Design a protein with these regions (language model features):
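C-terminal motif of bacterial Sec signal peptides marking the signal peptidase cleavage site
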Residues: 18-21
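Short, glycine-/small- and polar/acidic-enriched structural segments
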Residues: 28-162, 167-170, 179, 186-192, ...
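Soluble non-cytosolic domains of exported or imported proteins
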Residues: 67-71, 86, 140, 144-145, ...
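Pocket-lining segment of extracytoplasmic ligand-binding domains
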Residues: 91, 173-266
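Bacterial N-terminal signal peptides that target proteins for export
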Residues: 1-8
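Bacterial signal peptide processing site
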Residues: 23-25
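Secondary-structure end/capping motifs
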Residues: 230-312
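Conserved C-terminal helix/tail region of periplasmic/extracytoplasmic solute-binding proteins
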Residues: 301-332
Length: 332
């Protein structure tokens, strides 16, 4: 968990900097800064909430920045560079394990499965997981949710990631696709739309879904510092209201309309690719239907973290999960 040392260093550097948690824009809307871990169709409901005006209906103007990695996203949140982070719940556990007077609270779940796919360099007429034995596997960052879920799934199929694979984990998150495209690895774990783009370009072939294999977990969740939630409970509520409306929209709307709604966030991606990716995620129910983070999912998350050797102690559900905003959004 070397990334935590990076966070602590950055926070120390920024202790002299005071940033406003939120402010009013010229159009009278309250500004909320969101740091997302990556830009992905996996997060479609967030972008729907922006383009369909659901945040604006709640009196909010949401500014989204992409941090490109869980460590960078959490650094941004802790150092007050963002009010809300969209990132894996494991990051809140890591911060809690290090000791903090201002824990990171998960208040609204966005996705409920892993969002990565196994991409093979060579096409397979039929795929079985044991074909990965003795292969070169380009994985994700140690301690990150993609890598931990990947290892969990491999173990479920009788593969020891450390002993049965040549596992590469020293490549920065944002550079993993380029590394695979340049010839590194026989298999790679990728998010969409990169996996589908590689398949379309003949660089690789999607052979399995880690999300379909791993079960339901709080994979990406909106979270904020406890202090921000205490001081801005109404803002958090209105933000959650908009997210829930977007979640309902995604489940009730034809894929083509969803794709058109989020296309402004993916200007370099063809509409047919966006449609294909949304369908892929919808089929495996990756989009959470409500913002409520369930306790059983929280426990499975920690089982996965524990198997990866990154969990120091079980963190109780009520310690880092707050469901009152999601419940009110649903029941209002």
């Amino acid at each position: 968990m070397g990334w935590l040392r990076i966070i602590l260093c950055v926070v120390l550097v920024l202790t002299m900097v005071s940033l406003a948690a939120c402010s009013s824009s010229t159009n009278g809307l309250e500004q909320v800064r969101v740091a997302e871990v990556t830009r992905s169709i996996f997060y479609a409901p967030l972008y729907v909430a922006v383009t369909k005006g659901f945040f604006e209906e709640q009196g909010l103007e949401v500014e989204i920045t992409t941090a490109w990695g869980g460590d960078k996203t959490m650094t941004t949140l802790i150092s007050d560079g963002a009010d809300i982070a969209l990132v894996g719940s494991e990051t809140s556990i890591y911060v809690y394990q290090q000791g903090t007077d201002d824990p990171i609270i998960n208040f609204a779940q966005l996705t409920q499965t892993d969002g990565t796919f196994l991409v093979a360099r060579e096409e397979h007429d039929s795929f079985s997981w044991d074909q990965l034995n003795d292969s070169v596997f380009l994985g994700q960052r140690v301690g990150g949710m993609p890598q931990m879920v990947g290892e969990y799934v491999l173990k479920q199929h009788g593969i020891d990631p450390q002993a049965d694979l040549e596992l590469i984990q020293n490549i920065d998150f944002s550079n993993i696709p380029n590394a695979f495209a340049s010839g590194t690895g026989e298999y790679v774990q990728l998010f969409e739309p990169q996996a589908t783009l590689f398949e379309k370009e003949g660089i690789g072939h999607i052979v399995a879904s880690f999300g379909a294999e791993s079960g339901q977990i709080p994979y990406t969740v909106f979270m904020s510092k406890q202090s921000y939630i205490n001081d801005n409970a109404d803002t958090i509520q209105r933000f959650t209201n908009a997210i829930y409306k977007a979640q309902q929209y995604v489940y009730a709307t034809p894929t083509e309309e969803i794709a058109e709604a989020i296309l402004p966030f993916f200007e370099d991606t063809d509409l047919d690719i966006v449609i294909s990716v949304i369908n892929r995620y919808a089929e495996q129910e990756s989009y959470a239907p409500t913002p409520i983070l369930q306790e059983e999912s929280w426990l499975l998350l920690q089982e996965i973290i524990d198997q990866a050797g990154e969990l120091e102690q079980i963190v109780e559900y009520d310690t880092l999960v707050e469901t009152r905003f999601a419940e009110q959004a649903i029941n209002q």
